[in-house]
A protein has these predicted regions:
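Class II aminoacyl-tRNA synthetase catalytic cores and aaRS-like
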Residues: 1-582
């Protein structure tokens, strides 16, 4: 016995007169009195079937619950001209039912209609994800996900990379986010951790002599959700290369990313090499280390200029400005002011350049006449330009200017939605100051400092740059990477500056530190996020749209009821007791 001879997307005019079998879900039922039409759906498409004129057939078919699973056998016939559906691949034909069998009857009320253009609460969608995934949109997302991963794998293998699976149960290590911990039954009081990334393992593979490694790696981080970040787990194209420089990594991964986006999207994409932007320049020019280069607006630093003025809100402040090549309506300025206030800004000053090159706006009276020409020159202002001003401390001014730049780009419809703009952010600072003025690592502590040991010994730590890099696309960070610090002596000194002792390194990174004392090759790597790539390829507003069974924003799996309580017996086996804390 076979449930089907064809999928619901394969029946065509070539099959007219043939007996076929299909199986799928009942999407719609149309009872026209003497005849009943049903649309049968599987993951490939939809085929229309129609009953014979027999009363018992009509009665049976009309009472099948929508979304039940059925098997239909019948003869393919050509549709009448007036019933042809050009929207369906099978729209020229239909199946005249000889037998229809309900394989799985829906016995519960649907929490929402599948494949209908309606707004459904996310908690319902996630609780009944098995129904949500029946929708054409999510099915197509999963099909695309499978194809993208297969293509990534083919490219990496074709480029000489070896696929290696690394452990899922490992030790806890301080890599930035919180670990998911797994208690050991055998070793009382001890815990495994799910890996935040295969970072140490892939570096150990380089020490092992594996020249070029990759895997589609699951990563686990106990962190808060964002639109582009799902709590719990995510997947990345993890890769590492021995005897590699920063440029070697760029040359290896750029074609992979370019080819993938070109193959699975019709949007425009600039050919590699992708632009390189220094971190400091990115913060100044775009207000972020994840710039959306589709937005042509950029930020100007006017801090030095405004030291000459007496405008109180700008005194002793970092002042950033954004220029727009047009005058804007009063309503536009009011909306931008509302947005600025929502960010915590006291206001949003601006000036408009008139035809005679005079300046007009809320703050023009605070700029001396003799300095206005200087402002026009410094900001390269032209007739009909509008320039916005943001003032705060240096860090906050950059953040706010970046947000204002993004909002202006959206409101003025300057962003080309039909393109992907990639860029490398390079030359990250090795260290930064915490709120308590202590020096800490800015990003990846395993990165090689530019200048090596000499830089660590002679430079101000806050001026040392690292061989760290991010690849960003349309304002989304796809991945971070780095040239690794493979020299134990340089590693000890680098960690010492951040307040760690050699003993700390030996305890927290014992395997890696020990391995590096056995002749480690220089190595570098990166790990583009698969979920984020798919989010961009599908234009999804939330990363959960490209994951089969995601958690909600509270790190809950509403369908499976996770996290959940376990029995006292299970806890006892693990030598764990739960106590209430005040």
């Amino acid at each position: 016995m076979s449930y089907r001879t064809h999928t619901c997307n394969e029946i065509s005019l070539e099959d007219v007169g043939k007996k076929v079998k299909i199986a799928g879900f009942v999407e719609t039922i149309r009872d026209l009195g003497g005849l009943v039409f049903l649309d049968i759906r599987d993951m490939y498409g939809i085929t229309q079937v129609v009953t014979s004129g027999k009363t018992e057939d009509v009665d049976f078919a009309s009472h099948i619950p929508i979304e039940s699973s059925v098997c239909v056998e019948g003869i393919v016939k050509k549709r009448d001209e007036e019933t042809i559906n050009p929207k369906l691949k099978t729209g020229l034909v239909e199946i005249k039912i000889e037998t229809i069998e309900v394989l799985g009857k829906r016995t519960k009320e649907l929490p929402f209609e599948v494949n209908k253009n309606q707004v459904v609460r996310e908690d319902l969608r996630l609780k009944y994800r098995f129904l949500d995934l029946r929708s054409k949109k999510l099915t197509n997302n999963l099909i695309l996900r499978s194809k993208v991963i297969q293509y990534l794998r083919e490219q990496m293998i074709g480029n000489g990379f070896l696929e290696v699976q690394t452990p899922i149960l490992t030790s806890s290590s301080p890599e930035g986010a919180r670990d998911y911990l797994v208690p050991s039954r055998v070793h009382k009081g001890k815990f495994y951790a799910l890996p935040q990334a295969p970072q140490q393992f892939k570096q150990l593979l380089m020490v092992s002599g594996i020249d070029k490694y990759f895997q589609i790696a699951p990563c686990f981080r106990d962190e808060d959700a964002r639109a582009d970040r799902c709590p719990g787990e995510f997947y990345q194209l993890d890769m590492e290369m021995s005897y590699a420089t920063q440029e070697d990594v760029f040359s290896a991964i750029e074609p992979v990313i370019y080819n993938t986006f070109s193959k699975f999207s019709s949007k425009k994409i600039a050919k590699y090499p992708f632009p390189r932007i220094a971190y400091k320049e990115s913060i100044l020019k775009y207000g972020t280390d994840k710039p959306d280069l589709r937005n042509p607006l950029y930020i100007i630093d006017l801090s030095e200029f405004f030291k000459q003025c007496t405008f109180k809100p700008f005194i002793n402040r970092t002042v950033r400005a954004i220029k727009v090549n047009k005058h804007l309506s009063k309503g536009f300025h009011e909306k931008m002011l509302e947005y600025a206030i929502s960010l915590g800004m006291p206001g949003l000053g601006y000036l408009e350049v008139q035809e005679d090159m005079s300046l007009k706006g809320p703050i023009d009276k605070f700029i001396p006449v003799d300095l206005k020409k200087e402002l026009i020159k410094i900001a390269d202002l032209k007739s009909e330009d509008t320039i916005f001003f943001i003032a705060n401390n240096e860090k906050r001014a950059a953040e706010l200017a970046g947000q204002i730049r993004t909002e202006l780009g959206k409101r003025l419809e300057l962003i080309d939605e039909n393109s992907f703009q990639f860029a490398w952010i390079v030359d990250f600072p090795m260290y930064e100051l915490e709120e308590d003025e202590k020096i800490t690592f800015c990003h990846n502590p395993f990165s090689m400092p530019q200048g090596g040991m000499e830089a660590l010994l002679t430079k101000n730590p806050l001026e040392i740059l690292a061989y760290q890099y991010d690849i960003v696309c349309n304002g989304i960070e796809l991945s971070s990477g780095a040239v690794r610090n493979h020299d134990p002596e340089i590693m000890v000194k680098a960690f010492e500056i951040a307040g760690y002792t050699k003993k700390d390194i030996e305890e927290k990174f014992s395997a890696l530190f020990n391995a590096f004392q056995y002749g480690a090759p220089p190595h570098a790597g990166i790990a583009p996020g698969v979920d984020r790539m798919l989010m961009l390829l599908t234009d999804a507003e939330n990363i959960r749209e490209v994951i089969a069974f995601p958690m909600n924003s509270k790190a809950e799996d509403l369908m499976m009821g996770a996290p959940g309580f376990v029995t006292k017996e299970q806890l006892r086996e693990l030598n764990i007791r739960i106590t209430e804390t005040k």
